[in-house]
């Protein structure tokens, strides 16, 4: 009887802890592929892969320079106004210096994968939080 109670306690504890362990917050992950100084300027170029898994949120932000974006693998996004849009593979865009953008969450079951190219002021943070 004691053994059965002990096993039941372990099973109950596992059932209560497992969902919390699985409910970890999804986070975007940026892998810098190449960084180089631009000739004759105080700017640098940063080429990166940005992976945004389902449930992850990209806060509104700016850059101290330009950012070109190419969608490698698309996903569905929930915009700040609650509207959902598709970001298909092959789509490209440019975000200009100091203009806030993003503020979206990836919804559905696909990870958004972006190739980004930044030409930014050398030595400054690549991303600056925006209001």
Regions found by a protein language model. Give the residues of each.
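A short, N-terminal "cap"/entry segment at the start of jelly-roll beta-barrel domains
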Residues: 2-10, 14-15, 19-46, 93-96, ...
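Extracytoplasmic low-complexity repetitive segments enriched in small/polar residues
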Residues: 35, 54, 76-77, 92, ...
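Extracellular/periplasmic catalytic domains that process cell-envelope and extracellular macromolecules
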Residues: 41-42, 62-63, 86, 106-111
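A short beta-loop-beta micro-motif enriched in histidine and acidic residues
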Residues: 42-43, 56-70
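Short, conserved beta-strand element in jelly-roll/cupin
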Residues: 51-52, 64-78
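Short acidic-glycine-tyrosine-enriched beta hairpin
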Residues: 52-53, 75, 81-99
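Short beta-strand His + acidic residue motifs that chelate non-heme Fe in jelly-roll/DSBH
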Residues: 60, 78-79, 95, 101-108
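Ligand-binding loop in jelly-roll beta-barrel domains
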Residues: 99-123
């Amino acid at each position: 009887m004691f053994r059965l109670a002990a096993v039941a306690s372990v099973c109950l504890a596992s059932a209560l802890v497992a969902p919390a362990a699985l409910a970890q917050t999804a986070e975007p992950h940026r892998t810098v592929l190449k960084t180089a100084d631009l000739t004759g300027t105080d700017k640098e170029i940063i080429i990166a892969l940005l992976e945004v898994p389902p449930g992850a949120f990209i806060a509104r932000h700016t850059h101290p320079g330009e950012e070109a974006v190419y969608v490698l693998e698309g996903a569905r996004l929930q915009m700040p106004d609650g509207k959902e849009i598709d970001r298909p593979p092959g789509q490209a865009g440019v975000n200009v210096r100091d203009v806030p953008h993003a503020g979206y969450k990836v919804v559905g079951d696909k990870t958004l994968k972006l190739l980004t190219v930044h030409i930014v002021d050398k030595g400054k943070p690549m991303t600056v939080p925006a209001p």
